[in-house]
Every structure is written in C-alpha cells, then in structure tokens.
C-alpha cells in the first residue's frame, strides 16, 4: 500500500493490481478522508490510465451484491459527468428510447455530483424507485427491457468515498469509472466523456473490462454526450480494435443547435423535458436524444449505421414504445412500494 501511494505521489502509473490494493484499503475505511482526497488529487494530477480505471472499476464491481449475468445481451448508456454544461438528462432519456427500440438496457446512474440534476434525481421525481432488489432488476430487464440501478444502492462501497467526492467538487477518477462499474454484465456500451484527452483511456478501459462493442464519445463544445453543435469525436471499440471517428449531426439528417439550447434545470424541470421528448415534441432536446440514442443503437449493433440508428430511435418515440417503457417502470415502482 505505501509503495503504491509513493508511486502515485511521484506521478508513476500503477498496475491494475496495485490500484486495486489501494482502493480495497480505501473501501475498508483504513484511509482517512484527507488521505483519500490526496490520492484522488494525485491521480488526477498524474493522469489516470486505462489500467487504473479498469482496476478500480473491478474492485467496485467485486464488492457489489448486485452482480448479474442476464440471459440476453445488455447495454448501458452513460456519461462521465464533469462537463459543467448543465444540460438536461440526455442519457437517461435516451435509455428509454433504446429500450423502446428493442435493446435491453441496465441504466446505471447516480444523484448529481458535479451537475445540477443526476439521473437518479430526475427518475425519482418521475416516480421511479431507487431501491430495487437484484431479483426485481432481473424481472424488469426480462419484462420491460430496462431497469435502473442507483449507484449508491448497488455499490455500498461508494458510501465510503461519497463525502470526499462531494467536498472536492472536481472530476476525479470516479467520474471516469462511473459508467464502467455497472454490476450487470454488459455486452455493449455507449459512454460520453467530458475530456477529449480521456477518449483513448476510457475506450481502452472498456476494452480491458470485456466489452464486445462500445462507443466512447466527446461532444462538440465539451459535452460528455453527442452534441448538435458541431463535430463530435468518438472511438469505436470492437473486440481488440479501437477506431477513431467523427460524426456531425447533419450527416444523419439532424439540424445544428448550440449547446445552450439544451440547458436543463432542477429535477422537476428536467423531468418535464424528458416527458416532452418521449412524447415526441419537436425541440433541440428531442433531436439531441435522437442523435445520442441513434449512436447507441449503432454501438449495440441494433442498427447498421448511426443514420439507421437515428431513424430507429425516432420510431421508438413516435410509436409510443419509449414512453411506455418509462410508464412501465413507474408502475412497477408503485407495486414494489405497495408490497413494502
């Protein structure tokens, strides 16, 4: 442990096993808050590696009581956060579009850390439970093609670091690992990163964690989602191959909008935006979701191209299928609360 800490301070990279050892001590409460803060800041100053991100992700997954291998291919779509854009909950809304298009989605998310409203905040406002059991998650995936896994609920170990993350108020290695720690085995994934320098690192980490196919994207204007503002950079991960690409909204029939057209607000405001999108109301919000869901459908192999993915996403919304997935999740949540 001391050797690994010394390496971090000296700005030397850790192996997967070394980083796992460090954070096993952190999660066992053998490290003070000030020491943990120093570790996180030192890692950030050094620059986190794919091996370190993958190793920490594995530690968190190994401690989760929600580890699940579903009988069908599963995907997740999630951004790292940290872009300070105050955009609405794009990936949360897109998740229902994916499910409506026939993709099984284990949506992993949290409350707000460095943004105004997190996925858990907006879903809770809509009436979705944040405390499903492992068996209930499996049932929802089976019957409704989408389940929500609240990070603080499915990862008890994160409670040990929550206060420090909140106090620091800056993106740390935990922002990178958030999308990678889903306790449900994922076959494919769509990940947004706020930092273009992190594209390769996060893509490699996803590869190390066994994703068969993934897209890691950095949006125009610094979004951790695909943006309608201009050209977006992404990496396609497919087995042992990493391929750098770009995508512009006009290439898939979507108009250009500045990022300030997709500003969000508090949980109530974002819930209303989400509902307006799933009801198909024309706006920059809708087109942003079509863009991101389209890319995710391509990542999942449900669509042969991003253009086809956008059209499939549009059909998911216009048919009412996407909205029905949300309504089913709310209904299931009510039944669960009545039993309790």
Curated annotation (Swiss-Prot):
Task: Tell me the GO BP annotations in alphabetical order.
Answer: L-tryptophan biosynthetic process
List cofactor names only: Mg(2+)
List of residues binding 5-phospho-alpha-D-ribose 1-diphosphate: 79, 82-83, 87, 89-92, 107-115, 119
What cystine pairs are annotated? none
Its EC number is 2.4.2.18
User: Tell me, what is one Gene Ontology molecular-function annotation carried by this entry?
Assistant: magnesium ion binding
Keywords for this protein: Amino-acid biosynthesis, Aromatic amino acid biosynthesis, Glycosyltransferase, Magnesium, Metal-binding, Transferase, Tryptophan biosynthesis
Q: Which residues of the sequence carry a binding annotation for Mg(2+) 2? A: 224-225
Reaction it catalyzes: N-(5-phospho-beta-D-ribosyl)anthranilate + diphosphate = 5-phospho-alpha-D-ribose 1-diphosphate + anthranilate
What cellular-component terms does GO give this entry?
cytosol
Task: List residues binding Mg(2+) 1.
Answer: 91, 225
Q: Which residues bind anthranilate 1?
A: 79, 110
Q: How is the cofactor bound?
A: Binds 2 magnesium ions per monomer.
Q: Please name the pathway.
A: Amino-acid biosynthesis; L-tryptophan biosynthesis; L-tryptophan from chorismate: step 2/5
**Residues that bind anthranilate 2:** 165
One Pfam family it belongs to: Glycos_trans_3N
Q: Which InterPro entries match?
A: Anthranilate_Pribosyl_Tfrase, Glycosyl_Trfase_fam3, Glycosyl_Trfase_fam3_N_dom, Glycosyl_Trfase_fam3_N_dom_sf, Nuc_phospho_transferase
Q: Which PANTHER family match?
A: ANTHRANILATE PHOSPHORIBOSYLTRANSFERASE
Family, per entry: Belongs to the anthranilate phosphoribosyltransferase family.
How does this polypeptide assemble, per the annotation?
Homodimer.
Query: What does the UniProt function comment say about this protein?
Result: Catalyzes the transfer of the phosphoribosyl group of 5-phosphorylribose-1-pyrophosphate (PRPP) to anthranilate to yield N-(5'-phosphoribosyl)-anthranilate (PRA).
NCBIfam families from the UniProt entry: trpD (TIGR01245)
This chain belongs to the protein called Anthranilate phosphoribosyltransferase
Q: Which organism is it from?
A: Oceanobacillus iheyensis (strain DSM 14371 / CIP 107618 / JCM 11309 / KCTC 3954 / HTE831)
Q: Recite the lineage of the species.
A: Bacteria, Bacillati, Bacillota, Bacilli, Bacillales
Q: Which gene encodes it?
A: trpD
